[in-house]
A protein has these predicted regions:
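Solvent-exposed, non-transmembrane segments of extracytoplasmic/periplasmic domains
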Residues: 29-128
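Exposed, interaction-prone regions of secreted/extracellular proteins
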Residues: 125, 133-134
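Extracellularly exposed regions in secreted/surface proteins, prominently low-complexity, repeat-rich
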Residues: 135-196
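Short, intrinsically disordered low-complexity segments
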Residues: 129-130, 148
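Short, low-complexity, disordered segments immediately C-terminal to signal peptides
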Residues: 2-28
Length: 196
């Protein structure tokens, strides 16, 4: 028979709770494609990229419609990372055109550093070519320091000016900072820009 507790009796209920295993954390939304390769980006897949058949060169149109910046993927220094807000690749190449290929002159040789926001090629501002990229250093997830070498005088003199510039991803865009940023921006405005 069941009896009800009296006024001086206490009923104690014990609740057993099992802790569910924590759900695995997903990758951040920004790193939606952690397995992406640089070859999967617009640098290689853009319909504006001009492949050169029979060679390992890829031509990227410039802001001068008849010129192309030609580079070999085998001669590219890639620091592409689809899970970082800012990564880069240095392209070593030459100016030329679609019919004749590289110009083959000393003044046509150039470097371009292209930047990526996660797995997206940054095209605004457009990448600018310069005589040489002397060095690139990551200063943080959103900051990359580039030492740009500019041939400010004759081709025979080679690099005559050095610009140390911090390229920073801030507020949804790529900006330049540092003591040489204004001088670099002036030179970049006068050089060929890629239009990937």
């Amino acid at each position: 028979a069941c009896t009800s507790p009296g006024p001086d009796e206490v009923t104690v209920l014990t609740t057993v709770t099992e802790t569910a295993a924590a759900a695995p954390q997903s990758e951040p939304e920004e790193c939606a494609n952690p397995d992406a390769r640089i070859e999967d980006t617009a640098l290689f897949t853009s319909s504006q990229t001009v492949p050169f058949h029979g060679t390992d060169l890829i031509g990227v149109p410039t802001d001068f419609s008849r010129f192309l910046f030609l580079f070999s993927p085998a001669n590219m220094e890639s620091n592409f990372d689809p899970c970082l807000p800012l990564s880069w690749a240095v392209l070593h190449g030459s100016n030329g055109d679609a019919e004749r290929g590289p110009a083959g002159t000393g003044s046509s040789i150039a470097d371009v550093v292209v930047f990526f926001h996660y797995d997206e090629l940054i095209t605004d501002p457009a990448p600018s070519e310069i005589r040489s990229i002397e060095d690139v250093t990551r200063l943080g997830d959103t900051t990359v320091q580039v030492i740009h070498g500019h041939a400010g005088r004759s081709t025979a003199e080679g690099v005559t000016e050095i610009y140390v510039v911090d390229h920073v991803w801030r507020d949804g865009r790529l900006v330049t900072e540092g003591p040489d940023a204004a001088r670099y921006e002036a030179v970049a405005a006068e050089t060929v820009n890629l239009t990937p």
